[in-house]
Amino acid sequence: MRGSPGFCQTRRMLAATLAVLNFCILAVAQSKSRPPNEVAEHDPNLNSFQVFEFRRYSIKPGERQHFAKYFDTLFPEAFQQLGAVAAGSFLERGNETGFTWIRGFHTIDVRAVVHAAFYYGSVWNEHRDTLNNLITDSDNVLLLRPLSPERDVLILPAIDPVTEPNGAQGVVVAQIFAVKKDETEVFAREAEPAFARYRAAGAREAGVLVTLDVRNNFPQLPIRTDGPYLVWLGILHDNEILQREFIPVTEQVAGIFKASGHLRGAPELIVLDPTPRSRMRWLPSWK
């Protein structure tokens, strides 16, 4: 960073303040009332996130639950107040050290502002030593954008402690496709029949994301450069639906993906259990 430390800090604080003001103005302009204690399926205040990080951390053995509790307690509101969103946070099944979360930003420029405000701010400065001591790797990060406006990530309202006393429910699935260069769009079209079968098997599609091929404008946080990738996200009611309906369909359509000729390797299916305060979860109103 250029300039004196004091100047740089003032500039960061001003940029962060402007981002917060912009977010608050947007929220007031778009706000709509709803009955108290009712969890809405969609909140207009949470629109227009066009940049996402799909972050897969490795946590020290035996410490994942502790890390998840720190995350749920400290981070969701901290990001929201800066105009970003923790769209979902999860424990990876079949990987005892895997913690995955999705962070959204309105634009790529806002990403840099939010990161500077957060990682040079008071919340992270107070807790970074504790959290960094629990993380063994945090560099497995995909920088993504929605495939199209219609396939944007589903940003659900925050957990309501009154109507959802047991915390986030359901199962989230993420399927990651390593796509050949310049073939993402055609692969997405040819994969649509398979994705339609996922939805028919009980999955609520929560977004389709593809690699955002831009320069990392906050290089202090590395991102992967081995793309392109396509990530399909879905939410299931419970384990029974996952095992009885969804998993068999993924096995049946595997040949479609292989025969397409557009992939660099086999798709990776990740089964994710939401942390108690994860936004991305199965809503009580979804029957």
Language-model segments: residues:
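Bacterial N-terminal signal peptides that target proteins for export
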Residues: 1-17
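Bacterial N-terminal signal peptides
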Residues: 15-25
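An amphipathic, aromatic/His-enriched active-site/gating alpha helix that lines ligand/cofactor pockets
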Residues: 30-47, 69-88, 95, 104-147, ...
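Short, low-complexity N-terminal intrinsically disordered segments enriched in polar/charged residues
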Residues: 41-49, 161-167
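Surface-exposed interaction/gating patches
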Residues: 54-58, 66, 148-219, 224-239, ...
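Short, solvent-exposed loop/turn elements at beta->coil junctions and helix N-caps
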Residues: 90-91, 211
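Short acidic/glycine-enriched loop/turn segments that link adjacent beta-strands
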Residues: 94-97, 215
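Short, low-order "capping/linker" segments at domain edges
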Residues: 222, 277-287
